[in-house]
């Protein structure tokens, strides 16, 4: 059986790596992949990204199942195209992916279906947005409506920051079409968590909880990024909160999408804010697994990922069960110089470990160049390790990080600090 994974990041490397554990899988193709998937003897990179080319490849190679990693192909309708061609694919349709591709769509959906979220207003006119922010005060959150690779959210702690974010998106067009409409939300306080599930249109299977670290620098300082590290499980999601999230957020979302005539299949990721008194609100939806959360989650998943996806595609997730490694997994992202601004590319990476036990280095922004692994993107690697405690997993991951070198490498030294402290 052949499997195709679409994408080139650390998330896709982790998904492909987990798929190779299935003995019936003869080949895992990754399109377009990265240096990590190129080096792995169980994977083959395919240099294609266009939807039509992916469909043709899946037909020609008789791909049994396709897994979509990133948001962009989903919003381009890759699932619709594969289904039309009679091909098995795991992910939401273009219409369902609006939960992520349009913040305004997601907010209106949540209000309509009574799903707890922050109060908000949407603007296309810069003057009206400025007036609203002046009236509301800071701190306040400015979000680009469209997909902006994790960089479309500004948590403005001052009015000056809020006005600058509005100007960047609406007046200066810094994010292009993604920022032509902005959603302005109330600032929520508490602890964030990532809550991911698999959905088959009706049935829901919860995956392990996790917590991401969005800011570039230690102690959650510096600019927002796509994520600088993550760990699983997230102790902040207690059994009580888990049940509450399923009852008040996940179930109403899946039922609401079906009610709206847009049944949802695929991974669904709710970004949560958990207040000190146990209130939970939805910050955002993503229509795919998180990156870097996927890496620690896949390290802990003991069940067969292919079998779970087969159930999801066939509408039988109610028959599926998951088994998890009881240990913690923690991943540290190593990023290029200048990230999250325009990253420096082409630096050789040395010190990559050959063999690891209870740990794995997942590649993201890497390519093979004359047999050398070099940087090719903002987030370069996610060094992920298992441990009996968060502290031990953290120590194991950082031991490996310390061995890996490339010019200008950036990484946080405190991934998992909340759980270690807690």
Functional labels for PLM-detected ranges:
Residues 21, 37-39, 90, 112-114, ...:
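Solvent-exposed alpha-helices and their adjacent loops that cap or buttress functional pockets
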Residues 1-94:
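ATP-binding N-terminal substructure of ATP-dependent carboxylate-amine bond-forming enzymes
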Residues 161-164, 340-343, 388-395:
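Short, conserved charged micro-motifs
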Residues 369-370, 375-422:
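Generic C-terminus detector
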Residues 246-268, 286-356, 369:
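Active-site "cap" helix and flanking loop/linker of ATP-utilizing ligase/carboxylase catalytic domains
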Residues 155-294:
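Internal nucleotide-binding/catalytic subdomain
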Residues 4-5, 99-183, 211, 235, ...:
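Active-site nucleotide/adenylate-binding loops and adjacent lid/helix of ATP-dependent enzymes
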């Amino acid at each position: 059986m052949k499997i195709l994974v679409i994408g080139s990041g650390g998330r896709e490397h982790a998904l492909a790596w987990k798929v190779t554990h299935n003995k019936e899988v003869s080949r895992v193709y990754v399109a377009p992949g990265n240096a990590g998937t190129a080096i792995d003897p169980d994977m083959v990179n395919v240099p294609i990204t266009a939807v039509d080319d992916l469909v043709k490849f899946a037909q020609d190679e008789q791909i049994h199942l396709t897994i979509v990693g990133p948001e962009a192909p989903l919003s381009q309708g890759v699932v619709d195209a594969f289904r039309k061609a009679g091909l098995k694919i795991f992910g939401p349709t273009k219409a369902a992916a609006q939960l992520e591709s349009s913040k305004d769509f997601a907010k209106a959906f949540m209000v309509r279906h009574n799903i707890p979220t922050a109060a908000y207003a949407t603007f296309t006119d810069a003057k009206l947005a400025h007036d609203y922010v002046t009236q509301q005060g800071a701190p306040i959150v400015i979000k680009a409506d469209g997909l902006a690779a994790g960089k479309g959210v500004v948590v403005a702690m001052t009015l000056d920051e809020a006005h600058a974010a509005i100007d960047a998106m609406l007046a200066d067009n810094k994010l292009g079409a993604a920022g032509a409409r902005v959603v302005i939300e109330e600032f929520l306080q508490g602890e964030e968590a990532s809550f991911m599930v698999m959905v088959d249109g009706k049935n829901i299977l919860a995956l392990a909880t996790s917590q991401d670290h969005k800011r570039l620098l230690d102690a959650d300082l510096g600019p927002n990024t796509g994520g600088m590290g993550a760990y699983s499980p997230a102790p902040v999601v207690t059994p009580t909160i888990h049940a509450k999230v399923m009852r008040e957020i996940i179930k109403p979302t899946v039922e609401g999408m079906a009610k709206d005539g847009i049944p949802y299949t695929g991974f669904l990721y709710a970004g949560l804010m958990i207040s000190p008194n146990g209130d939970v609100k939805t910050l955002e939806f993503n229509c795919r697994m998180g990156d870097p959360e996927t890496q620690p989650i896949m390290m802990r998943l003991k069940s067969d990922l292919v079998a779970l996806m087969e159930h999801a595609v066939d509408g039988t997730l109610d028959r599926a069960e998951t088994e998890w490694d009881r240990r913690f997994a923690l991943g540290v992202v190593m990023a290029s110089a200048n990230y999250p601004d325009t990253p420096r590319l082409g630096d050789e990476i040395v010190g990559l470990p050959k063999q690891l036990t209870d740990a794995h280095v997942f590649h993201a922004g890497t390519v093979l160049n004359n047999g050398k692994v070099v940087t090719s993107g903002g987030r370069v690697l996610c060094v992920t390790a298992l441990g009996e405690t968060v502290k031990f997993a953290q120590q194991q991951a950082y031991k490996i990080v310390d061995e890996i070198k490339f010019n200008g490498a950036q990484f946080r030294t405190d991934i998992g600090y909340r759980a270690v402290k807690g």
